[in-house]
Structure formats: C-alpha cells, structure tokens
Amino acid sequence: MAVGKNKRLTKGGKKGAKKKVVDPFSKKDWYDVKAPAMFNIRNIGKTLVTRTQGTKIASDGLKGRVFEVSLADFQNDEVAFRKFKLITEDVQGKNCLTNFHGMDLTRDKMCSMVKKWQTMIEAHVDVKTTDGYLLRLFCVGFTKKHNNQIRKTSYAQHQQVCQIRKKMMEIMTREVQTNDLKEVVNKLIPDSIGKDIEKACQSIYPLHDVFVRKVKMLKIPKFELGKLMELHGEGSSSGKATGDETGAKVERADGYEPPVQESV
C-alpha cells in the first residue's frame, strides 16, 4: 500500500471549513464633508473611513483627502462648468473641515470654446497670497471679430498676442498678490479676474471666453487650526476634541506584569 495521506478521510476536516465572511463596512464610519463659508451649500457629502483601532487613528486616514465638487452643487445652480478641489485639513467630531486646494474647468466647456478662425491665447503665473499660499494660475482667452467686420477670420498678430499675455499675467498677479486665499476664492467663484482681463484687453484686440481655466496649489503655509475655523465661520476658539481620538488600544501579552518600581 502506498504511504501518504488519505484525501477522502481529511476532506471533511477543519481545513475545508469555510471562513466566516465579515462585512468590511461594519468596521467603517461615515463622516460629513464640510466646505468653507465662501460657498452657499456647506454640507457637500459624506466619506467613509475605517474606525480607530489600536494605533491606527481614523482622523489620520481622513486628513489629506481631496474632494472634487462642481460649482453647481456649491451654489445650487444648474449651469456651472467650474470644478473646485477641497482638501481635508482637520476633523472635528464627525465633520471633515476642508480648505481650497485647486480649481479646473470641465472638459466639455474647454472643448466647446476651441474653434477655427480665431486665436487662442494662454498665460500662466505663480503668485503668493498675503497669507502664504503659493498658487499657479492658468488663463485662456480667444479673439473675436471687430464690430462691422466682414472678414471671416479674426487672427491676432504675434505682437498683439504677447501684449495680451503680458496683460493677463499682470492682472492675475495683482488680483492674487494683494488678497488672502479666502478673497481669491471669492473672486474665482464668479470669475471676476477673467472679466477684468477681457475689459483691459479690448484696446489691444477684442476678446471673448476669457477664463481662469485652472488653479493649482503649489505650497501651503504651516497648518493653523484658528485660521481654518475662521474659514468655516466658527471662530478661532475651538476646544472640541475629535470623537475618535479619545484613546488608543494597547496590545499586551497574556502573562504581562508591570515592572516593580524601586521607589514610589
């Protein structure tokens, strides 16, 4: 007889028993995502995170999460082609307090503006706000026909393009350099910077569809809870402790005994 395991006998043993299926969502909690006070609608959604367990704290898993939300959802408007990025900077109870992290135009809007028979002019600039945020702003604009123009095309000369680009950079630098982040975001919501550029460039060549198409966050200053609470309109005095940071579970061996102290 061949020496070896009899597979038929061991088939119904412990090895073949199915593991108990645990629902992964039973170990997770829902947190509300709160937008800063610049926007009309503050509660923008919920996010999921694994509960605090041992040294792994739930709020640490939430900090740094980036949420991309359409401006239509912020302002309760049907038509909006701007997307704002918000980053979680702190967790208070079951609320994730976010801050501005960037802006972008939707792809369909960008594609709808690019057409034949006109010149597309783009510019970008790196600017620092008064409260220490370094932003990179991208601007785009398109030439349009003069009044009473018969010719089909409206192409700008290279010299005019350079002048318009210079004007774009000047206005973007001026608008951001003299304001803090909150005021810059308030200007980005209606895109007053794009309208200012359009007015200023009319004397060089008539423009239309002038937008700040993208804003990137390059550097942020050291985190201050007081400033974040001001952005959320809750004042600087906030002594709330995070609900999940009450204590961390410490693993001990079964036969663990504390060391004997020589003196008390």
UniProtKB/Swiss-Prot annotation:
GO terms classed as biological process: cell differentiation; ribosomal small subunit biogenesis; translation
GO CC entries: cytosolic small ribosomal subunit; nucleolus; small-subunit processome
Modified residues annotated as Phosphoserine in this record: S236, S237, S263
Spans annotated as Disordered: 233-264
Pfam family for this entry, one: Ribosomal_S3Ae
Modified residues (Phosphotyrosine): Y256
Keywords per UniProt: Acetylation, ADP-ribosylation, Cytoplasm, Differentiation, Isopeptide bond, Nucleus, Phosphoprotein, Ribonucleoprotein, Ribosomal protein, Ubl conjugation
Biased composition (Basic and acidic residues): 242-255
GO function term, MF aspect, one: structural constituent of ribosome
Classification via InterPro entries: Ribosomal_eS1, Ribosomal_eS1_euk
SMART domains: Ribosomal_S3Ae
Positions where ADP-ribosyltyrosine occurs in the chain: Y155
Quaternary structure note: Component of the small ribosomal subunit. Mature ribosomes consist of a small (40S) and a large (60S) subunit. The 40S subunit contains about 33 different proteins and 1 molecule of RNA (18S). The 60S subunit contains about 49 different proteins and 3 molecules of RNA (28S, 5.8S and 5S). Part of the small subunit (SSU) processome, composed of more than 70 proteins and the RNA chaperone small nucleolar RNA (snoRNA) U3.
HAMAP family: Ribosomal_eS1_euk
Function of the molecule: Component of the small ribosomal subunit. The ribosome is a large ribonucleoprotein complex responsible for the synthesis of proteins in the cell. Part of the small subunit (SSU) processome, first precursor of the small eukaryotic ribosomal subunit. During the assembly of the SSU processome in the nucleolus, many ribosome biogenesis factors, an RNA chaperone and ribosomal proteins associate with the nascent pre-rRNA and work in concert to generate RNA folding, modifications, rearrangements and cleavage as well as targeted degradation of pre-ribosomal RNA by the RNA exosome.
Name of this protein: Small ribosomal subunit protein eS1
Species this protein is from: Callithrix jacchus
Taxon lineage: Eukaryota, Metazoa, Chordata, Craniata, Vertebrata
Gene name of this polypeptide: RPS3A
